[in-house]
């Protein structure tokens, strides 16, 4: 048997490169989570999941590691502190958490609590998010930045919050918005604290590049900024402008794009200062990316820079432009939500079954009587028996041609169902035999490099792709997926992952691999009576809130976990996933009404002797249990 180590597994899943030293594999072959990159302590994911199941918490389970979240906040702030010290930057840096990344109360609560030491702020983009921001700022003095479109009610709420004493900045996204703010300021007699969003010509890269540039959805053009300054001056509100904001997109993959935006944005700041606008803050927005695939490249699922390089470039570029222009260096704000939240959340679920040929007839005995088979099938038998490394190309090409021929002959009525089934069986056996030979050949013949895709098996996972990792479906985002056990054993299956929705789009066919993107995920054959779990990593940003209820699969169970030196871990919070009745409620159905309707019908059927009392009672009991139960699959 070929020797296999946990280092081999770490390599094929590229774990060291995307894991940010927060994930590792222990001697048991299980994935572990660390509270910080330098910590020797860890939590065994498989052991944790087993313990949760004993507590009747069923998969799929969303695990939120709050120490990891704190560590990411600390890492970003530490990088900026170092950059400020190294560059002798005379002003400050401040992190703002964009609530849209993950609005869950416990998440925002943890960020607000831990972020106190860094004077962390909250960025909001809607009225509901504004209410959340005010809630957390009450009694805590947390600063708030308001982005996005705003109506009269929104603006008036911000104005009165400002008067009461909240530190709240309202960012002007469009000229018509500024006119509303000025009118309401006059009406209420309350002076706002204003920011102006600048529409830069610089653009980001990757999936969100259109967030920047001349055609961006938000921001004022340069001519509009001049008009805004004039309008504010006329209304004696120019001194209310304390901030400028720009944003060229989420997940910026190239550091040079960030530098270009910083240079252009800081020039705007410098020119506005020269025009007499007392700006104190430059909000550089989001864009600090996450290396999802570990390639450290400019590919859309990666970034070609580190947090430290990002922070250093921000500080250096802004200082350099300000000194050149002869203006004061501003306080710097960033809204790095993705980089803050992505790593702390892991979805773990069980694999249910596979589309393998385990239950197919075994035609092994038939091989001895091949002369009685149809010619096409007989040729496949001959290839299977004689194949070796010297005839690989020819045998592979012949196999492809013969299986196509078998399908055509079956459609024309010249092959029986059993003969076509045997042809399929032989096709799989031949490909696996070829694969066994190919793995030992270097270099692999070019035409055989992609044939392994034919061997890919579909593993069905107990989750909804649309609910738990919607970006995988919507924008083809890569997320690392790794089995959380048996990593001291060599995987023996090349797989895709399908969810349990009734939708063909509910399948993942692109994965993070050793050399970047790959079309299959190495997994193990599932043993009889074995619980086999996979983890979906780096899903803490956007996925929960973007998830939808396709097939009415609801929120998963969620567990907040912190590290504990004595016991290994501590469960802080358990949030139950949606029961069936809760999912139905989202679409205006009421569980009690459904039960009553069915019960009334059952009583009529009992009276007409269509069903027995026992059958009716048992059916209603099953229906009631289903309404109260988890939307995902059990045994």
From Swiss-Prot:
Coiled coil: none annotated. It comes from the Bacteria. The modification N6-(pyridoxal phosphate)lysine is found at residue 100. It is an enzyme of class 4 (lyase). The keyword Lyase applies. Its cofactor is Mg(2+); pyridoxal 5'-phosphate. InterPro entries: Ala_racemase/Decarboxylase_C (IPR009006), Arg_decarb_HB (IPR040634), Arg_decarbox_C (IPR041128), Arg_decrbxlase (IPR002985), De-COase2_CS (IPR022657), De-COase2_N (IPR022644), De-COase2_pyr-phos_BS (IPR022653), Orn/DAP/Arg_de-COase (IPR000183). It catalyses: L-arginine + H(+) = agmatine + CO2. Substrate binds at residues 282-292. GO terms for molecular function: arginine decarboxylase activity; metal ion binding. Pathway: Amine and polyamine biosynthesis; agmatine biosynthesis; agmatine from L-arginine: step 1/1. Disulfide bonds: none annotated. This is Biosynthetic arginine decarboxylase. The lineage of its organism: Bacteria, Pseudomonadati, Thermodesulfobacteriota, Desulfuromonadia, Geobacterales. The gene is speA.
